Amino acid sequence: MFQNAQAQVHVNVRLNVGTQPVWGPVGYDYVDYYYMPDIDVFYNVPRHQYIYLQSGHWIFASSLPSRYHSYDINRGYKVVVNEPTPYHNAAVYRTKYAGYKNNHGQEIIRNSHDSRYWENKNHPEHNKWKASQNSNGNGHGNGNGHKN
């Protein structure tokens, strides 16, 4: 009368807090892309690439082109986008986030006092994170061998 049923639960947790740029917004454990409405540019977080239109083609580059030399990436608003190839729907993002142009009230990782961001090697508190990693062993297997 009784049937045995087995359930399998798969939990996929993605984290990339330590690899997000320090100019990115706080509050996200994982980010695929940022969209920057001020300059209509995407940034691929895992690949560390800017994606922008040039002569009708999407360009993937490690830095912004010279036409954005006056853009302050620390102050510009960034929209977190976690979907594949959002630049293929750029018109949707332009329209949806046009109201965020010139919005400079977003807290960025570099200015955060949240210790989860200290893992980022470019964060001002990174050395505190490194020190905490070195002292987490509490004398058990932390590489400090003992001679008898």
Regions found by a protein language model. Name each.
Residues 2-4:
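N-terminal signal peptide c-region/cleavage motif recognized by signal peptidases
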Residues 7-148:
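Glycine- and aromatic-enriched low-complexity segments, predominantly in secreted/extracellular proteins
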